[in-house]
Amino acid sequence: MSLHQRSPESLPVAIIGAGPVGLAAAANLVERGIEFVIYESGDEIASSIRQWGHTRLFSPWKHVVDPASRRLLEATGWQLPAPEGLPTGAELVENYLEPLAALDSLAHRIRTGVMVEAVTRRGMDRTRTARRASTPFLLRARTVEGVEEFTARAVIDTSGTYAYPNSLASSGLDPLGLADVTDRVSHALPDVLGRDRARFAGRHTTVVGAGHSAANTLLALAELTEQEPETRITWLIRNASAVRVTTSDDEGLAARASIGRRVDALVTAGRIAVVDRFEIVRLGRTDDGVRVYGSRAGELVEHDTDLVVSATGFRPNLAMLREIRLELDEIIEAPKRLAPLIDPNVHTCGTVEPHVFAELTHPEPGFFLAGMKSYGRAPTFLLATGYEQVRSITAWIAGDITAASNVELKLPATAVCSTVCS
């Protein structure tokens, strides 16, 4: 049964997050003539991307623009930037997302500065079942005016994961002592060569993490050492090697392969010191920086540094969904049917199958996780896949089950990956 058969059509669809996937959901709803409201926590659209706007994506323009959004934009004379060019996050916002959000069909439906803190059913906690599917959703949000509540016929949560990093500690909990050194620990993807340059120049930075966010920061720090020779770099990983970063013979995406080769070369040249098999348990403050306490090969060890960059990946904020009936994989916290397709122990970006609404459903009819948040803790998210998700979800909301069930995404033979996006 589709949503239009159960829920009041007079209510809008609520989209949480005005990043690329949230705006793509809106574009698809525009084409289907369905009312919606986007609730964005930041003061501007794409607030998470703006924080790492200096970082260049691995994927070219032709793979990072949603088809429905492109149709709406091209109707106004907009042109796709150089299809093979690789945009930075800032260029993605300036040349695509801002023009999209400014369209008459979207602009008046976007509310910024609205932090959704909880989603439930109106008058129902998660234990009540009778007439649940036909009861509107209720969103509670914090705004500049205070706490407000909104109702919706369906909810698409595209709020991303960038604001919710994984722990530095191997336990998954914040390391002991973190509160004492927060001023010396940076979030993933700091702007080392731009606004954050003074913080890192001439200092010893330890980058923690084994993915491409870590690699991008390592490369930026290496470039900084050429201008500020006193700058030192340590790369701390908990496994024996950083398999997602190091060069692979079968890597088909040139930009991503280049990162692996460049990091390998810097390590070989001794410009990046690698400390492997280090599991962090505690952080302590020193006169000049941070002391990292951990276990390495079964022995207690210490590592001193001026600054720490936490590039350990991200996790979804599920606390806001406590009253929603979710069915999540117990390991990666993705929708149960999607999880086997994206398990990072099995799949890379190039092997994740396209999927539609059926893989994204929960026991809560009309509620969907989409975009980066739908991948839980898996690091293999593709923007193109997020666009396909919301195309299918919005078709289901419209009652077009045939379109919702069809897979329209045609992935190229090689991987198509984005850096972190909301």
Question: Where do the protein language model's features map onto the residues?
Answer:
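C-terminal, flexible cofactor-proximal segment of oxidoreductases
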Residues: 2, 311, 315, 321, ...
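Conserved Rossmann-like nucleotide-cofactor binding loop
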Residues: 21, 44, 162, 213, ...
